[in-house]
From Swiss-Prot:
GO molecular function, one term: metal ion binding
Stated name of the protein: Uncharacterized protein MT0763
SUPFAM superfamilies noted in UniProt: DinB/YfiT-like putative metalloenzymes
Chain intervals with Basic and acidic residues compositional bias: 157-169
Segments of this protein annotated with the region Disordered: 151-172
Highest taxon of the lineage: Bacteria
InterPro entries: CHP03086, DinB/YfiT-like, Maleyloyr_isom, MDMPI_metal-binding
Record-linked Pfam families: MDMPI_N
């Protein structure tokens, strides 16, 4: 799948779920035990804002609009524009984990956003059967990249959790990245 299309589909999945989150749910727990729903949303919006800050020629994001959905959409649009710009896929991004080309970074962002869309769905009682084609692709990418060095306390991912093969691909992705699928 085209990386820009995949990125947009992950952002769209998150936005669709976010539109159904009620204010009284924001303090609730998520599959990421250290985060509330509001923290999870902030992580995704903030991650999108960081794309410009980590670019070879750093770009500060515009002021956040009011409202969670508007803030996400604005930050996602700017991140997408940076990747889609001429040279965006070959540009070097300076992440905390090191320098990576745009082609790699967009895949990391896509997986992060889709996985946190799953977290948001699970936390708010929405369907976790998210974009099966995209989830299959991101699961394959995660299997290639996420080894034992990235799992455990103080690391980005918990150990892989069991997930029946008949479950939707997004559930399988979530379980591979350490979420308990119910």
């Amino acid at each position: 799948m085209d990386p820009l299309m995949a990125h947009q589909r992950a952002q769209d999945a998150f936005a669709a779920l976010l539109a159904n989150v009620r204010a009284d749910q924001l303090g609730g727990p998520t599959p990421c035990s250290e985060w509330t729903i509001n923290d999870l949303i902030e992580h995704v919006v903030g991650g999108n804002e960081q794309v410009g800050r980590w670019a070879a020629s750093p770009i500060e994001p515009p002021a956040r609009p009011d409202g969670l959905v508007a803030a996400h959409q604005a930050a996602a649009a700017v991140a997408h524009e940076i990747f889609a710009a001429p040279g965006g896929m070959s540009a070097t991004f300076k992440l905390p984990l090191g320098e990576v080309p745009g082609q790699v970074f967009i895949g990391l962002r896509t997986t992060d956003v889709l996985t946190h869309a799953w977290d948001l769905a699970a936390a708010t009682g929405q369907s976790t059967d998210l974009d099966p084609e995209l989830a299959v692709e991101r699961l394959a990418a995660a299997r290639a990249l996420v080894g034992p060095q990235f799992r455990g306390p103080g690391k980005p991912f918990a150990d892989e959790k069991p997930c029946p093969r008949e479950r939707p691909p997004a559930d399988q992705l979530a379980a591979f990245l350490g979420r308990t699928v119910r």
